[in-house]
Curated annotation (Swiss-Prot):
Keyword annotations: Ribonucleoprotein, Ribosomal protein
Superkingdom of source: Bacteria
GO biological process, alphabetically ordered: translation
Gene Ontology terms, MF aspect: structural constituent of ribosome
Family stated for the protein in its record: Belongs to the bacterial ribosomal protein bL28 family.
Protein name: Large ribosomal subunit protein bL28
Length: 72
């Protein structure tokens, strides 16, 4: 699946867009994904991953150790 966050597992959700006249139209809500090159210290290399904005905050707080576990 191409639009899935590697760390958090966020993926598209489905729902309704609701107009002012209360008309409902089915729509797909995409996660806030960004392609990033991240340095993995354990492997001594850059890795290209798709991450959500929340995942980038998690990595900023905890480091890349969690991400390295997922890549193995």
């Amino acid at each position: 699946m191409s639009k899935v966050c590697l760390l958090t597992g966020k993926k598209p959700k489905y729902g309704n867009s609701v107009s002012h006249a209360n008309n409902h139209t089915r729509t797909r809500f995409e996660p806030n994904l960004h392609t990033k090159k991240i340095w993995i210290e354990e492997e001594k290399q850059f890795v290209k991953v798709k991450l959500s904005a929340k995942a980038m905050k998690i990595i900023a707080k905890t480091g890349t150790a969690e991400l390295a576990k997922l890549l193995k």
